[in-house]
């Protein structure tokens, strides 16, 4: 497993299937946050709220045993990520393709 941003040069690492990509949510969140800081909207507010739910998992497991952290990380993020993904897909249909929000969302979807 390799955690990195969406730098295109890393794609070759994942092609063989020997290395699994673990995307960096911090980079995706930052892109949305930067758009929100310049021009907050209900859409960017909700996106940041949904991402904060993922971060809350880490806060909740801080101080827990390694086994408890692993169990929480396996169980809790997947439905939140699927919901975020589905919601962003829906939002993308309503956004101008070249808008800053659409670009930030496209980065997250990579």
UniProtKB/Swiss-Prot annotation:
Keywords: Plasmid. It comes from Escherichia coli (strain K12). The lineage of its organism: Bacteria, Pseudomonadati, Pseudomonadota, Gammaproteobacteria, Enterobacterales. This is Uncharacterized protein YuaH. InterPro entries: Transposase-related, Transposase_IS66_central.
């Amino acid at each position: 497993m390799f955690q990195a941003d969406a730098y295109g040069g890393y794609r070759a690492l994942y092609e063989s299937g020997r290395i699994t990509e673990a995307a960096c949510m911090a980079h995706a969140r930052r892109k949305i946050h930067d758009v929100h800081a310049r021009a907050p909207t209900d859409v960017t507010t909700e996106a940041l709220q949904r991402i904060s739910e993922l971060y809350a998992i880490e806060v909740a497991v801080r101080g827990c045993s390694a086994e408890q952290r692993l169990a929480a990380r396996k169980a809790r993020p997947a439905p939140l990520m699927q919901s975020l993904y589905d919601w962003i897909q829906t939002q993308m249909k309503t956004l101008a393709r070249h808008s800053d929000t659409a670009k930030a969302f496209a980065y997250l979807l990579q």
